Design a protein with these regions (language model features):
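Low-complexity, intrinsically disordered/propeptide-like segments
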Residues: 8, 21-22, 33, 148
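Generic low-complexity, intrinsically disordered sequence content enriched
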Residues: 9, 22-23, 63, 87
Length: 318
C-alpha cells in the first residue's frame, strides 16, 4: 500500500460514519457497494449537520443497504492524493459534496464520479458539468421577484445594485422576469464598493424597494452597515439575502429549509443509485420557501403586512 493510500485510510477510519454496514480497515479493501455514497466536506456548522442528517435519513429509509463514508475537508483530503486514490482505486457510485470547497475539490479530479452538490450557490457552474447536479441554496430570480410581489403587492418599481461581471447574467434574467410580472426593474451598476454611496443615493430616488441580489462586490460585511442605514434613512425597504440582515434592519429575506434541501438532494441521490444518469437531472432551487420579517423596520417605513404574510413567516423580528 502506498504512503498516500495509508494516509487516506487513516483519514477514512477516523472520519467515516456508516449508518448501515461496516468498513474494512484497509483502503484497498473498501470495495464500495453499488449503494455507497461518499459524503465530502466540512460538517461543523449546524445547518450543514442538519442538511447531511436529513439526506442520510431519507436514503436509509429508501435504499436498503445504503452506506455512507464521511470525509471532512479538514483532513486535507482535498489537497492530497487521498481523493484521487479513492476515485482511481474504487468505483465510487456517488459523491455528495457539502459546500462549495468540496464541490470544487471533486471537479479538479480527472474522471470524477457522479456528483451531487449540496449547499452551493452556483447553478451556472453546475450546469457546466454534465456529471454533476444538485440543489442550490439561492432561489431563482423569478421566484424572488414573485415573492416581492406577494409580500409587497403595492410596490411596482424594484431596484438592484450589481456588479456586471459577477451578476450581469442574473440581472438580465431578472429584467425579463420583472416584465412578465408587471414590475418595473431598475438596475444600477457598481464596479467597486467605493461606488456604493453614490449608486445608492441615485437608485433610491427612483425605486420603491431595493432587492439584495447576492453579489460579492455589493453585499458583504464591509458594505452591510452602509446599505442598511441608507435604506432606513430613505425609507426604501431592503430585501436581504438572509435572516441575519433582517435582524440587523432589512425588511425581509427568503430563507431555505436545510432539512427539506437534504430530502430534496436525497431524492436526486436515490435516482442516481437506481440507475438514472446525473446528466438527466437538472439542478434545482429549494422547493420550500421560508421567509423572515422585521416588523420594527416595517413600522418605521409605515408599511403594513397582511395577516397571512405575518402568520406565514418562519421568523419575525419585532
Amino acid at each position: 500500500m502506498t504512503g498516500s493510500m495509508q494516509s487516506w485510510c487513516k483519514t477514512v477510519c477516523a472520519a467515516a460514519v456508516l449508518l448501515v454496514g461496516t468498513v474494512a480497515p484497509g483502503a484497498a479493501d473498501l470495495a464500495l457497494a453499488e449503494s455507497s455514497v461518499v459524503v465530502l466536506g466540512a460538517q461543523t456548522r449546524a445547518e450543514h449537520k442538519q442538511f447531511v442528517a436529513s439526506f442520510k435519513q431519507f436514503l436509509v429509509e429508501q435504499e436498503q443497504g445504503v452506506q455512507f463514508f464521511d470525509i471532512a475537508l479538514g483532513d486535507d483530503i482535498g489537497n492530497t492524493d487521498g481523493l484521487k486514490d479513492i476515485i482511481r482505486q474504487n468505483k465510487v457510485p456517488l459523491i455528495l459534496t457539502v459546500g462549495p470547497e468540496a464541490f470544487q475539490s471533486v471537479l479538479r479530479q480527472q474522471a470524477a464520479p457522479p456528483l451531487i452538490a449540496g449547499l452551493t450557490y452556483d447553478a451556472a457552474e453546475l450546469e457546466k458539468h454534465p456529471n454533476a447536479t444538485g440543489v442550490v441554496l439561492e432561489y431563482r430570480v423569478e421566484t424572488q421577484l414573485a415573492w416581492i410581489k406577494r409580500i409587497l403587492p403595492d410596490f411596482k418599481t424594484i431596484g438592484v445594485l450589481y456588479n456586471p461581471e459577477a451578476s450581469g447574467q442574473r440581472v438580465a434574467a431578472a429584467k425579463k422576469a420583472a416584465t412578465k410580472l408587471g414590475l418595473k426593474f431598475v438596475a444600477q451598476e457598481v464596479n467597486s464598493p467605493s461606488e456604493l454611496p453614490v449608486a445608492m443615493e441615485s437608485l433610491f430616488r427612483r425605486v420603491d424597494v431595493l432587492w439584495g441580489l447576492t453579489d460579492p462586490v455589493v453585499l458583504s460585511r464591509q458594505t452591510a452597515k452602509a446599505i442598511l442605514l441608507t435604506s432606513f434613512r430613505n425609507k426604501v425597504p431592503f430585501i436581504a439575502p438572509s435572516s441575519a440582515w433582517v435582524k440587523a434592519g432589512a425588511l425581509y429575506s427568503l430563507e431555505v429549509a436545510y432539512s427539506d434541501i437534504g430530502v430534496q438532494t436525497g431524492e436526486m441521490a436515490r435516482s442516481v443509485l437506481r440507475g438514472k444518469r446525473v446528466s438527466s437531472i437538472a439542478p434545482q432551487e429549494p422547493r420550500e420557501v421560508r421567509y423572515s420579517l422585521n416588523l420594527r423596520t416595517a413600522e418605521h417605513m409605515r408599511l403594513k403586512f397582511s395577516g397571512d404574510v405575518v402568520s406565514g413567516a418562519a421568523q419575525v423580528f419585532e
